[in-house]
């Protein structure tokens, strides 16, 4: 199941959170959901060159808050903040309420799955070999701290007549483990031969759930009697740890002296 299902949806309410955080009645839900889709489509086209990895939409009382996670925040803000003000006005026309835009910088874009997929798509559109682009992205991700990465490309690769799928993996990518922090991203490359789809899975390590506590191993009790690691022998009917008498030891000599 972990191989086919969406990694983020599979881990919702366990280790991942929703991309839209608001509550609406059944009457207004479809309208607000449609507005969210319009906002995401608009930002995808408007900020295609700004390396935006994730968009979080929140709706407090009678306003909206949009958080952009970008590797190039200066491109989003623009000169003297002109671009960000124009962005707010356009978003307010779509949503119909005042919009606040927050920008969070992505410190390591090389291990962000969405940004990796977008980077590979841009390289494919520039006629770079898909294997070279995929392997270079994997090397950069592993070098900057990712514990595993998997990249899949599908379509008419290198202009082949028959579409096919190729994927590469390096490190661990445990898709069935719910506590695994799996970042997932998808992108499309519009080439002269057709559309090529890119999927990226990045494993950033295991994380604890909301109700989990770290398990601390209790130290083992020291057995100070006898040698360390030596098996204990109760000696049959005697006291625990006492060896039975053998021929030639002290007990045998005492019995011989008594008989004399």
Curated annotation (Swiss-Prot):
Binds the lower part of the 30S subunit head. Binds mRNA in the 70S ribosome, positioning it for translation. Residues 39-107 form the KH type-2 domain. Residues 234-260 have a biased composition (Basic and acidic residues). Pfam families: KH_2 (PF07650), Ribosomal_S3_C (PF00189). This is Small ribosomal subunit protein uS3. The gene is rpsC. It comes from the Bacteria. The keyword Ribosomal protein applies. GO terms for biological process: translation. Belongs to the universal ribosomal protein uS3 family. Keywords: Ribonucleoprotein, Ribosomal protein, RNA-binding, rRNA-binding. One of its GO terms (molecular function) is mRNA binding. One of its GO terms (cellular component) is cytosolic small ribosomal subunit. Residues 214-260 are annotated as: Disordered. PROSITE patterns: KH_TYPE_2, RIBOSOMAL_S3. It comes from Azoarcus sp. (strain BH72). Coiled coil: none annotated. NCBIfam families: rpsC_bact.
């Amino acid at each position: 199941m972990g191989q086919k299902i969406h990694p983020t949806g599979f881990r919702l309410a366990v280790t991942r959170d929703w991309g839209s955080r608001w509550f609406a009645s059944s009457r207004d839900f479809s309208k607000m959901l449609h507005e969210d889709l319009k906002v995401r489509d608009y930002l995808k086209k408007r900020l295609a060159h700004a390396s935006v990895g994730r968009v979080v939409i929140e709706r407090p009382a009678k306003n909206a808050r949009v958080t952009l996670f970008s590797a190039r925040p200066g491109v989003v803000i623009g000169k003297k903040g002109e671009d960000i003000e124009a962005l707010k006005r356009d978003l307010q026309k779509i949503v119909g309420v005042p919009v606040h835009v927050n920008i969070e910088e992505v410190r390591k874009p090389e291990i962000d799955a969405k940004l990796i997929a977008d980077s590979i798509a841009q390289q494919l559109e520039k006629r770079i070999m898909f294997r070279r682009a995929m392997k270079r992205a994997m090397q950069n991700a592993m070098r900057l701290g990712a514990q595993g990465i998997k990249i899949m490309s599908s379509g008419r690769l290198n202009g082949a007549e028959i579409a096919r799928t190729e994927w590469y993996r390096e490190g661990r990518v445990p898709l069935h483990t719910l506590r695994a922090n799996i970042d997932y991203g998808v992108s499309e490359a519009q080439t002269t031969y057709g559309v090529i789809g890119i999927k990226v899975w990045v494993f950033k390590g295991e994380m604890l759930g909301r109700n989990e506590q770290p398990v601390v191993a209790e130290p083992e009790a020291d057995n100070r009697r006898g040698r360390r690691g030596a098996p204990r022998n109760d000696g049959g009917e005697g006291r625990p740890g006492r060896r039975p008498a053998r021929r030639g030891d002290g007990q045998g000599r005492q019995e011989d002296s008594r008989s004399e």
